[in-house]
Amino acid sequence: NRLSGQNHYKASMREEMDTDWDKGAMYGSQIKNRELNAYFKFGMPVGPGVYDEDQQDELRSNIAFVADYDRFRERAYFGLNDYDGTDNMVSLNMMYNHYFSFRHSLIVGVQSHLQFLDESLLNPTPWLDAAGAWNLDRQENEVGAYAEYTYTIKDKLSVVAGIRGDYNGYYDKFYVTPRGHIKWNITPTTILRGSAGLGYRSTNVITDNIGVLATGRHITFERPTALSAGAAAVRGPLNPGSAYGGYTTWMVADGGAGNFKALNRMEKALTAGGSLTQIFTLVKEEDATLSFDYFRTQFYNSVIADQEYSPNDIYIYSSDKRSFTDTYQVDFSWTPVERFDIFATYRYTNSRMTIDRPDGSTALVERPLVSRYKALLNLQYSTRYNRWVFDVTAQLNGPSRLPTQTGDLADSEMSPTYPMFFAQVTRKVGKFDIYVGCENILDYKQKHPILNADDPFSAGFNSSVIWGPLMGRKFYAGLRINFY
């Protein structure tokens, strides 16, 4: 649970905020999450085993059944915006793993995924003479089958090829997703990995973009360029006796979800890439490792929460326009002396998406609030038997593009580059680990993280543009018990 808001705001003040927002009431927000999970798995060996004399080991084919139930409830309000969602999910999976030999194996299975979602969203923005009340209830059931073949040569080569097909009842479509992975030990110290796979994901647009509720904007589930052509949408008065009486509301003819139901929430993306790892000697034999990674995710359909089209609105829509993310990463690890480890990493991200513009065109822009690069250096030293462990980390966070608040992309700015430092000391005493540490040692904080904070009940209010730490220097201490 999390309660926040203006100074001295309490949960008991919510009703006053709802009714007297225009009379100086305090702004507040609260998120309550509840989750219940149950899991069952049964497996048994079947058929004869395969024996490898070199490995002195036996593998048995097996069959397994897995059942998983998850219930997640989230209730949240941000000022006048109110969200209530319950997700009940049941997953059933039956699989058979067959070993032809130590080198060849095949996994086949069938799976069903049942999901029942009860969601409602109230987005009153009386300062814009508009509001939205949305019923987002839906049932998403999916059944499918899959197969995965693995070929392995110990310490040399591993090849995995898989495919699955799923029918989704909500979209009334059949989806095929092939995937592959290869690992090749070119030499004992040089390893090449590669993978590629097509993926689909049905998005939960509110919980995936919960930050849109922390604004004073009007939310619409439709492309801004198509808004005027929406035949199902109608405008009408709110109940005059409501807290926001007299203002108009954006409703739809089917009871509040017409535009939402027309939204194609099924994202489609292809991810491909690989890595090259080299183990080498600096001081003692094979004491260092250097690896290079590159992965690209190409979106063929993506869901966008666009707050840059208009200063008063947030448009949530699907787009098949150009959208991708390229990630480059270099990792270096070295143990120059016994019990002293050095780890360094650098990651560069080029993430772009296409958004609609008011003149009817589109623009390929840098994805907002995604750091262009991150660098990290970690030093760790432990005494004999790990009685003392000293850990220091330095982190450099690169700039990210901040979404424009005016609707004009020329007004978009970049966040600054900033460092972060962390330190921890651990003392081992028997089965106990006693530790003390400090986070954000330099006490770096984002300045003015809330836009238009002095007028929270307005379209200009926005507390979702967060690119840096909000908490300053933090000291902590703790105790761990090791039972094994």
Q: Where is each model-derived feature located?
A:
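Surface-exposed extracellular loop regions of Gram-negative outer-membrane beta-barrel proteins
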Residues: 58-79, 137-183, 334, 339-350
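Membrane-embedded beta-barrel scaffold of Gram-negative outer-membrane proteins
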Residues: 62-75, 185, 193, 225-315
